[in-house]
Amino acid sequence: MTRPFSRGRGGGSALLALFLALAAVLFGSAPVPAAAGGAWWDATSRPAPDSQINVTGAPFTGTDAQGKVRGFVDAHNHLMSNEGFGGRMICGSTFSAAGVADALKDCPEHYPDGSGALFEHLTGGDNGKHDPVGWPTFKDWPANNSLSHQQNYYAWVERAWRGGQRVLVNDLVTNGLICSLLPRDRSCDEMTAIRLEARKTYELQDYVDGMYGGPGKGWFRIVTSADQARSVIQQGKLAVVLGVETSEPFGCKQILDVAQCSQADIDKGLDELYGLGVRSMFLCHKFDNALCGVRFDSGTTGVAVNIGQFLSTGTFWSTEKCAGPQHDNPIGLAAAPAAMAEKLPPGVSVPSYASDAKCNTRGLTRLGEYALKGMVQRGMMLELDHMSVKAAGRALDMLEAEEYPGVLSSHSWMDLDWTERLYRLGGFAASYMHSAEGFVGEAAQKAELRKKYGVGFGYGTDMNGVGGWPGPVGPDAPNAVKYPFRSFDGGSVIDRQVTGQRTWDLNTDGAAHNGLVPDWIEQIRLTSGGQSVVDELSHGAESYLTTWKRTEDHEPGVNLAAGRPASASTTQWWNPFVNFSPALTVDGDTGTRWASEWSDDQWLQVDLGSVRRVGRVTLDWERAYARAYRIELSENGTTWRSVWSTDAGDGGYDTATFDSQSARYVRVHGVKRATDWGYSLYEVAVNRS
């Protein structure tokens, strides 16, 4: 919070105050020292002029009586998206060494009247014009429905922290195709943008530290481990986690269904991201890529994104009937936005889709599986949001096979039917920043599951993420915020937020920027059923850190079958140029496979070398999978007992778990095929439990 300079009544202090005022006028921002002996949360040298924080009281520190940290989690934010998309999609900066007036200014093409703001027009943020002036008047932006203007000015992030937020996931984000369609001042290469956004996040940490007396002293702390995050939160500061949400990670786009990256590119890319401090990421976003298919957007947005997919990859989305209760978003038949439709080649139009075909045909590719395994090896957390249900289901199968807890859903883009599988693994979930009523309603849908698994809850603001935010409810609404109000812990008083000449009120302005998150949480509390939701949100930080710590501590189970002798009832032999030996199921290479002859009663078995304890068998099926099969064990290779069976096999990854038993031989016994082919397995893994 900005505080006036004061050091007694002497003429020297008055002269210094006059000098600082003149410096602010003539040279822009000048630091304003805090009073001697000020509280740790007050900056010792804040720029002036600057935004106010409008929160008084000490940020809570330490832990609760059970030794757990408290605080909210913003599981999905984009602090630096103004640096992505070619640098001109999101106008205004999170910070500037030249001060607030330089940070909170519009893009050059928006002047003088907003008529050149192409992206703002496309997304409905204005009626063809807007006042481009940010600081100090902010007549038209930021606003809850303006998708092209900065919402994450550092002081607004500071206000969210002062209101009780203790974890912020900063997803580094961009999209090369969108960049190519908009005004830009830099490269559209996605990895170049990701590197820049990471660097700018570290520069923001340095910028905040400079206000507090030097390195490590500010409230904005980038963390790379769960233990670091816990220490930061116990100090009462904000733990900032780096994530990645981009359409072509490591250059892994697909063109006409041909991957444009290799396993080597993935290894190099994951190593680089980990070195930058990234600990969570999406494998695909908006466009189908070489790693996975996406969950569709709906309505007009869906049509526009589908056109973007075609322009980027040469393919439109392809749909099929869903295999289970989970489904992707319906694409719909909305008219294509003219500005996008005119980009299509002559004679090409957006295809129509059957109303009962709601699932993306594309799932998790072999390269996607390789990338996911690479994330597991590096202790990184996977974001399921934006994955098609086919891809998400396959990813969950793989994570369950590894008993890997590092799985997240950060902003309501995962089918809710996956929630229990996520919690069973030990993952963390958050909902998008809907209206207070919408957020409470969505939270209620899985409240019993959170109670069952003893987990907290989070929100994903998606600020600067082109999503739209809660609008005004009016001062007379039943859940209208009464200013000033107290933070959830009772330790701070929060008043209307003031930046320059503009005062924001959530009731009349909606959630225009990140600084209004505490106000939105207060509105949730005032909504019917909202107090219990706020209570769950206050446990979000602990739950997020628990997921992260378990991810770091995960130890892969020993595959008892790796490299052991394998045999089979039959092997497909009639193609002399391809090897389908049963030994290929235990070679650790998902690019090779065993294939049987084309009949039902077939088996594959592995000799573990000696009697071992066995409690889990994982199968990676090729398209020729078993509808019905059983897992059998034996000590001598002649006398077998069935320990697990199914008659509803659906291919992909299968994990059979059963009470741990002694066995030397493990057999997969096919009873009924799901296809006209035989049975085919890429890999078989056997574990103790």
Regions found by a protein language model. Name each.
Residues 641-659:
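Extracellular carbohydrate recognition and processing domains
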Residues 2-35:
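Secretory targeting and sorting signals
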Residues 35-361, 366-373, 392-400, 407, ...:
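N-terminal hydrophobic targeting/anchoring segments and the immediately downstream early-domain regions
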Residues 669-676:
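Short beta-strand-plus-loop segments that form exposed binding edges in beta-rich domains
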Residues 612-623, 668:
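A short beta-strand element within beta-rich, extracytoplasmic domains
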Residues 26, 557-609, 620-625, 645-648, ...:
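Disordered, acidic Ser/Thr/Pro-rich linker "stalks" and the adjacent N-terminal cap
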Residues 629-631:
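Short beta-strand elements bearing conserved aromatic residues within extracellular beta-rich modules
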